[in-house]
């Protein structure tokens, strides 16, 4: 574990081949494993399916953008806009002490799963209608 001369924090070794975790000054996080979150049903209460998921997804935009707060101003990124997510799924958005909004992308997975299920139901309904003609 340590801070290397190139300002990279590493755990597990001093090269990409032996690193288990690496965070650089640009804010990039690389690891050998997965990012996980507790999801055990024993830790959850008041479980409800997300209603109208497809209509919520339709209110979001998948966008490309460049950032104005990094050294690499030309690098193209993809993602969503926190304020737009907050309007339809506020539990996926937080705000830091400086008022900068953050998106917990993992918290959007449930919404996407339910919207796919809604689309599947629509497709199945259309198939049935076509078969019955």
Go through each PLM region and give its residues:
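Flexible "stalk/tail and boundary" regions
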Residues: 1-15
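C-terminal intramolecular chaperone/autoprocessing and neck/assembly modules of extracellular spikes
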Residues: 19-105, 119-133
């Amino acid at each position: 574990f340590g801070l290397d001369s190139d300002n990279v924090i590493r755990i597990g070794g001093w090269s990409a081949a032996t690193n288990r975790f690496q965070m650089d000054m640009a804010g990039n996080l690389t690891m050998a494993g997965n990012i996980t979150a507790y999801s055990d049903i024993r830790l959850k209460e008041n479980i409800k399916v997300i209603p109208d998921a497809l209509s919520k997804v339709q209110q979001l935009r998948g966008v490309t953008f460049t950032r104005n707060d990094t050294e690499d101003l030309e690098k193209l990124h993809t993602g969503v806009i926190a304020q737009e997510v907050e309007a339809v799924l506020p539990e996926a958005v937080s705000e830091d002490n400086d008022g900068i909004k953050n998106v917990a992308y993992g918290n959007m997975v449930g919404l996407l799963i339910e919207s796919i299920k809604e689309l599947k139901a629509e497709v199945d309904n259309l198939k049935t209608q076509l078969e019955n003609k």
